[in-house]
A protein has these predicted regions:
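Helix-boundary and loop/linker segments of multi-pass membrane transporters
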Residues: 2, 33, 81-82, 127, ...
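Transmembrane helix-bundle core of multi-pass membrane transporters
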Residues: 30-31, 36-106, 130-133
Length: 197
């Protein structure tokens, strides 16, 4: 039963990304202009609310997620055997990072996002609808987080609290890597992954 893996890989990020749009519009947006602690605490608190809601709906044990047959097993990469699913994860990660980099560095929309992160007032002066930009950024971020959780599920099961440890790590990566630096965040994330094994 359940939705096929490949379909769910598309549907889950879209559904959660849409929920992210609603959260940004009605919960996060009223806090813009306030100290950064306020939206930060709200999103941390919201994460715990979501965990409890998932526990109520899906149970405390979580749900086992089976990886597709095509991604099971291992392949010889010359220095030993490596799980096919982990190679698939590396491929997806590279594709997502490349897509984000192209979006932020090579498009007008990316220029607006980067400018807004530095000085939102300039964008308002230029007539850019900053609220719409942040709405789409938040939706994209929640969608990508959902994809990461979905892809991790076959390795550890879809448990209600599976995202909580990642919250702290994401915060560390953002702070050390630099708020506006995608390359800094990538390198910090890679470093953290290597340290954790």
């Amino acid at each position: 039963g359940g939705m096929p893996f490949w379909l769910a890989m598309v549907v889950v990020p879209l559904a959660v990304g849409t929920m992210g749009l609603v959260v940004e519009r009605f919960l996060i947006r009223p806090l813009y202009g306030r100290p950064i602690d306020d939206p930060l605490l709200l999103t941390f608190g919201l994460a715990y609310v979501v965990v409890e809601l998932v526990r109520i709906v899906a149970g405390k044990q979580g749900i086992p997620v089976e990886m597709p047959e095509a991604l099971q097993g291992a392949v010889d990469i010359g220095i030993g055997f490596f799980p096919i699913y982990r190679l698939f994860l590396i491929g997806v990660a590279v594709a997502v990072v490349a897509g984000l980099w192209l979006l932020l560095e090579r498009t007008r929309y990316g220029l607006i996002i980067r400018a807004g992160a530095q000085d939102p007032l300039i964008l308002r002066v230029l007539g850019v609808q900053v609220a719409r930009v942040w709405l789409l950024v938040f939706g994209l971020g929640t969608g990508l987080a959902a994809m990461a959780g979905f892809l991790a599920a076959p390795l550890q099961g879809a448990a209600p609290e599976m995202g909580i440890p990642v919250l702290a790590e994401a915060f560390v990566v953002t702070v050390i890597g630099g708020m506006g630096s995608i390359m800094g965040s990538i390198l910090t994330g890679l470093g953290l992954g290597i340290v954790e094994g």
